[in-house]
């Protein structure tokens, strides 16, 4: 069985990192026994993925409401509102 050395991003300790459950996206979460911080190696933030902004704008242009867009895209309502608010600005 292969062993992977996991380093705490907060205190840089290589010993004392233990598994601590899973995130809602099913990524392994770790806990540092030295500084008591938690982290995960993979992190998926749906709102920052490429194409999210354009999908939200397209849905708004097709008459889909803000709450429905948030529910369909799997992001928060404030994320949809922020993308719509910033859609007039040049990127």
Curated annotation (Swiss-Prot):
InterPro entries (alphabetical): InsA_HTH_dom, InsA_N_dom_Znf, IS1_transposase_InsA
GO biological process per UniProt: DNA transposition
Disulfide bond sites: none
Sorted UniProt keywords: DNA recombination, Transposable element, Transposition
Family per record: Belongs to the IS1 elements InsA family.
Its job: Absolutely required for transposition of IS1.
UniProt name for this protein: Insertion element IS1 protein InsA
Protein source organism: Shigella flexneri
